[in-house]
Amino acid sequence: MSNVAGELKNSEGKKKGRGNRYHNKNRGKSKNETVDPKKNENKVNNATNATHNNSKGRRNNKKRNREYYNYKRKARLGKSTENEGFKLVIRLLPPNLTADEFFAILRDNNNDDGDKQDIQGKLKYSDWCFFEGHYSSKVFKNSTYSRCNFLFDNLSDLEKCANFIKTCKFIDNKDNITIPDMKLSPYVKKFTQTSKKDAALVGTIEEDEIFKTFMNSMKQLNENDEYSFQDFSVLKSLEKEFSKSIELENKIAERTERVLTELVGTGDKVKNKNKKKKNKNAKKKFKEEEASAKIPKKKRNRGKKKRENREKSTISKTKNSNVVIIEEAGKEVLKQRKKKMLLQEKLKISNSSQPQSSSAQTQPSFQPKENLFVPRVKILHRDDTKK
């Protein structure tokens, strides 16, 4: 049976090997022959020693590589070992205590005979920073205490300042007295000095072309009111932008005129006049060229073809309009004829129903009269001709 892991086992529960070829090393030998166990032991020992030595060599190489990498990295990223100083943090000062009140209390507690105003000379701090606190307006919220930080160049000066501040009592405007808590900060942040060298781009803005165009455009905006009401970029020359806008407006106007003439057809007469003028000028030029040149040049018949096509299109349009007019006139004539026919039928019906009178019999039928009059024609003869 196969195990869950997919390994085959014997009936005894031992794992099966890959086959007889791997684990039966005495195959092909007689049973009487014996194998020296020392030879096999020596082989095994040599193999283990070799693997152990190889693993040691790899570990040593890794260590060397790490040390070399760390050495290079430290050399590249190494910082200057300057004395950053020491910072004394004074905490748990009264909440409403201000910086002026804090230094006033320090001056009052100065018992030296010297000037009380020169407290920095006594404490010997290089820099200071004060953070003012406040009382909380909510009942269940703690008030924030004020604090002060001093920077010193030496630890001895820091210790003297700390011993002096321990003797002081700080009071705020609400008569709350607190004893401050002082600690040495492990992290000191100092602002690095700015480089005295000027940057490469300092003083080159006046030579920049974009800056020049900007200044010129600002002057033009102040001088001309036309530019102020248009959306032009200030970083480009306003004169060019204005000329471009005028060209665009002219092109748009021409295109709108073309579209309107195509839709409405009002500009046909103007076009025909212009074309006639062009044709006349072309004919004059052609005649002058013929007179100047000895060899006559053939003229292309492009204009004639275009004219013929246009005439055909105009004729078809006029024909269509005439057909419509004729149809309407024919309809009106047919209506009049129908009315006459109806009137004649009504007269016939009325005459058949009534007895015919003598006057009606004597009257001839309604017929159109023929032209009985002979036209008068005069024959004229010339005097020269013989009669």
UniProtKB/Swiss-Prot annotation:
<feature type="short sequence motif" description="Nuclear localization signal">
    <location>
        <begin position="284"/>
        <end position="300"/>
    </location>
</feature>
<comment type="similarity">
    <text>Belongs to the RENT3 family.</text>
</comment>
<keyword id="KW-0866">Nonsense-mediated mRNA decay</keyword>
<dbReference type="GO" id="GO:0005634">
    <property type="term" value="C:nucleus"/>
</dbReference>
<comment type="function">
    <text>Involved in nonsense-mediated decay of mRNAs containing premature stop codons.</text>
</comment>
<feature type="short sequence motif" description="Nuclear localization signal">
    <location>
        <begin position="15"/>
        <end position="31"/>
    </location>
</feature>
<dbReference type="GO" id="GO:0071026">
    <property type="term" value="P:cytoplasmic RNA surveillance"/>
</dbReference>
<feature type="compositionally biased region" description="Basic residues">
    <location>
        <begin position="55"/>
        <end position="71"/>
    </location>
</feature>
<feature type="region of interest" description="Disordered">
    <location>
        <begin position="1"/>
        <end position="71"/>
    </location>
</feature>
<feature type="compositionally biased region" description="Polar residues">
    <location>
        <begin position="43"/>
        <end position="52"/>
    </location>
</feature>
<dbReference type="Pfam" id="PF03467">
    <property type="entry name" value="Smg4_UPF3"/>
</dbReference>
<feature type="compositionally biased region" description="Basic and acidic residues">
    <location>
        <begin position="30"/>
        <end position="42"/>
    </location>
</feature>
<dbReference type="InterPro" id="IPR039722">
    <property type="entry name" value="Upf3"/>
</dbReference>
<feature type="short sequence motif" description="Nuclear localization signal">
    <location>
        <begin position="58"/>
        <end position="75"/>
    </location>
</feature>
<feature type="compositionally biased region" description="Low complexity">
    <location>
        <begin position="350"/>
        <end position="368"/>
    </location>
</feature>
<dbReference type="GO" id="GO:0005730">
    <property type="term" value="C:nucleolus"/>
</dbReference>
<dbReference type="GO" id="GO:0070478">
    <property type="term" value="P:nuclear-transcribed mRNA catabolic process, 3'-5' exonucleolytic nonsense-mediated decay"/>
</dbReference>
<protein>
    <recommendedName>
        <fullName>Nonsense-mediated mRNA decay protein 3</fullName>
    </recommendedName>
</protein>
<dbReference type="InterPro" id="IPR035979">
    <property type="entry name" value="RBD_domain_sf"/>
</dbReference>
<dbReference type="GO" id="GO:0005737">
    <property type="term" value="C:cytoplasm"/>
</dbReference>
<keyword id="KW-0539">Nucleus</keyword>
<dbReference type="GO" id="GO:0003729">
    <property type="term" value="F:mRNA binding"/>
</dbReference>
<dbReference type="InterPro" id="IPR012677">
    <property type="entry name" value="Nucleotide-bd_a/b_plait_sf"/>
</dbReference>
<feature type="compositionally biased region" description="Basic residues">
    <location>
        <begin position="272"/>
        <end position="285"/>
    </location>
</feature>
<dbReference type="GO" id="GO:0045727">
    <property type="term" value="P:positive regulation of translation"/>
</dbReference>
<feature type="compositionally biased region" description="Basic residues">
    <location>
        <begin position="15"/>
        <end position="29"/>
    </location>
</feature>
<feature type="region of interest" description="Disordered">
    <location>
        <begin position="345"/>
        <end position="387"/>
    </location>
</feature>
<dbReference type="GO" id="GO:0016567">
    <property type="term" value="P:protein ubiquitination"/>
</dbReference>
<feature type="compositionally biased region" description="Basic residues">
    <location>
        <begin position="295"/>
        <end position="307"/>
    </location>
</feature>
<dbReference type="GO" id="GO:0006310">
    <property type="term" value="P:DNA recombination"/>
</dbReference>
<dbReference type="InterPro" id="IPR005120">
    <property type="entry name" value="UPF3_dom"/>
</dbReference>
<feature type="region of interest" description="Disordered">
    <location>
        <begin position="270"/>
        <end position="317"/>
    </location>
</feature>
<dbReference type="GO" id="GO:0000184">
    <property type="term" value="P:nuclear-transcribed mRNA catabolic process, nonsense-mediated decay"/>
</dbReference>
